[in-house]
């Protein structure tokens, strides 16, 4: 059978009708296009029918929404009062308060945390992928040079690290691995290894499900509509933390620095002390 451009467009259109996201279809396009290009080079076909067919097929990406302050407070209170999920509270507070990527969070070691000066040094991240030794964690540099940064701790984050140290001692969650020459990881499983990113998103999903189950039952008893928590991921916590900074009038350049997204042109704290002051004020919250 000769593959034609119309066949590919029909295929993508069918996937779109099935509700697949544009990003998913784009991924398929990225697999098909070079494969057919190779067939052209080998003389199997004369023309690549896939090239230029991506278009805007598929559902657009949903805009990621941050939790409101009320939702954030309710969620953290629920976790704090839960015997099942309370051990996850410090990690969530760090991600909310420091606006860290999940890879940066699980890659934190105790040597990265300066409790005296209340700063977090972010200089790398842990990524999980298949290498020569199979699937395992790899120490990686941050996505950009901007990812290397020192983040002032809020009071919530400072207390979270203190609590996590207590939990590690109480439950024996000590890091027993060395990855890329780094050791002493803060957030670990019961086996002494860093928590996987999928594991973080898994317990966040379970927390929201448990919260909504409790809220639905309470709303039924009080004869009102339940105020359910939306689905969240590790990125939601980071995005929410950034939103809180904006609500506290932190300078956009300082926000970019904290998020690890600032552009070249000098350290933002060196040119805008008001931004640093706002971060310091935010510490007490």
Explain the meaning of each model-derived region.
Residues 1-44, 61, 83-84, 194-199, ...:
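N-terminal core-binding DNA-recognition domain of tyrosine site-specific recombinases/integrases
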Residues 37-62, 220, 225:
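Short, charged hinge/linker segments at domain and secondary-structure junctions
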Residues 18, 22, 77-88, 98, ...:
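Short, basic (Lys/Arg/His-rich) helix/loop patches that form interaction surfaces
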Residues 6, 17, 59-87, 97-100, ...:
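Long, amphipathic, Lys/Arg-enriched alpha-helical "connector/arm" segment
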Residues 1, 45-47, 58-77, 123, ...:
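DNA breakage-rejoining catalytic core of tyrosine-based enzymes
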Residues 58-59, 66, 126, 259-284:
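Catalytic-site neighborhood detector that most strongly recognizes the C-terminal catalytic loop/helix
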Residues 117, 128-148, 155-157, 218-224, ...:
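C-terminal secondary-structure termini that scaffold catalytic or DNA-interacting sites
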